[in-house]
Design a protein with these regions (language model features):
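A conserved amphipathic terminal alpha-helix motif
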Residues: 1-13, 141-175
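Beta-strand/loop substructures that line and gate deep hydrophobic ligand-binding cavities in soluble
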Residues: 3, 25-27, 105, 109-156
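A short, structured loop/turn motif at beta-sheet edges
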Residues: 38-40, 68-70, 94-101, 125-134
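Hydrophobic pocket/interface hotspot
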Residues: 41-42, 51, 75, 93, ...
Length: 175
């Protein structure tokens, strides 16, 4: 497919990790398997106290100012670099089907919650088979220019974040 970047990494534990970029459609597709129960993976994606433990790529940290996980609710958070620079964002939840799917609109913002002009729509799907939970994430970017601007850092950062999540889930699962 033209304008597509694809990365597949099975790692040492043979869990699927697929990251595909389709610039023509302004889409990013991520499929990642975790050796953890679906309810735990769901919690890791939907509870601020868990999200903040894995979402920021090292050495950054994440700090949620507030979260209201319901349709129409928001999470307002920052990624903080080692020099203290904060990059704020808003996630507005647009659809929630407990334990299996949630959708949100994500947009960068300033510290006062004033959003930038363009954001992205995220669709998270969760399923479990034989103790392995698969998370499928589809991300539609409103602006190709925005997508291309953040893509390199996003790709590296998301891979690091999902690796952090794998480690957190292993600790929480005691596997």
């Amino acid at each position: 497919m033209l304008n597509e970047e694809k990365s597949r990494n099975s790692g040492t534990n043979d869990l699927l990790f697929d990251f595909t970029v389709d610039k023509a459609k302004k889409m990013v597709y991520i499929t990642r398997e975790f050796d953890a129960e679906q309810s735990l993976v769901w919690d890791a994606f939907t509870k601020a106290e868990l999200i903040d433990q894995w979402i920021a790529p090292h050495p950054m940290i994440a700090k949620t100012k507030y979260q209201d996980f319901k349709v129409g609710g928001k999470r307002f958070y920052a990624m903080i670099s080692t020099d203290g620079m904060e990059r704020w964002a808003i996630q507005e939840y647009t659809s929630i089907t407990p334990k299996t799917n949630f959708k949100m609109f994500n947009v960068f913002a300033d510290k006062d919650e004033n959003p930038e002009p363009h954001g992205s729509d995220w669709d998270h799907n969760f399923s479990e088979q034989n103790g392995i939970t698969t998370v499928n994430i589809s991300i539609y970017n409103e602006s190709l220019e925005r997508m291309e601007k953040i893509l390199e850092g996003f790709t590296i950062g998301m891979k690091m974040s999902l690796s952090n999540l794998e480690n957190l889930l292993a600790t929480l699962s005691k596997k």
